[in-house]
């Protein structure tokens, strides 16, 4: 948090974790919210304060896409959340097995530089969610069995971005939230926020009932207690009938009031990717515009104010923002 604090005017009681321009600070909503939509749509979501996307660093068009995405987020007065996926170079033999080694020895340095260049522009802050859900072993090439291998990968990329021009990149370490997530912790100096995934499907319970947002979130909350970083639900999805999903979202809106460490959420409004099959069958997490409105419509949250106070006036934060240990 130290490098974030330098970006704050002393005593400023409005803003996100750091460095957001005044046009963002003055938004009505006090809880960050947004959605990833596939296919991406030109029309912005009403009240959305986060623009979310996924980028593979081996995509030759990645730098240009990042530039245009950041421009779009700025025009919409939203915070950019970019999930950077370190897929192996398909032209390299067995690169899926040697990804960590190849990154460590510098084979991907030019690719990393190419995607960091637009991210390091001084015009706006960006949340960089790098190599997400690494604790789902085997799901991605970076979902390695050994936590220390992942840590070496993460810190190698983070180190390449340690540069004065990149101070507005805020790093989001984003496990799925499994019991072994702590094995992949890259160190507090390399993490500004912890991202988690919250999904619920009636197929995942023995009685066909949806697990509530609170039930799933509570199983992830230990990450905040252990590492003392604010939480962001970086991916969220619910399946079922529209009526079931509406009820789930309404309950979620009420539940977030109980979590002062939670600063926002992002809904994954898209079908489950076909190349990441689920044991319970295909899921479509897409929401109608009406239901997405429940995700992004303003809902004040105590968490936002506590995070502001933590950064700008820590003495006052200690008096009124006692985050529960339970």
Predicted regions and their residues:
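N-terminal Sec-pathway targeting helices
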Residues: 1-15
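N-terminal substrate-binding region of glycoside hydrolase catalytic domains
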Residues: 25-108, 238-241, 266-267
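Alpha-helical scaffolding within the catalytic cores
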Residues: 34-41, 62-70, 110-115, 175-186, ...
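Aromatic- and acid-rich polysaccharide-binding/catalytic face
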Residues: 49-56, 181-210, 268-270
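Glycoside hydrolase catalytic-domain groove-lining segments
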Residues: 68-85, 184, 189, 199-240
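Aromatic-lined carbohydrate-recognition surfaces of secreted/lumenal glycan-active proteins
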Residues: 154, 162-180, 230-239, 267
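Substrate-binding cleft of secreted/luminal carbohydrate-active enzymes
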Residues: 234-324
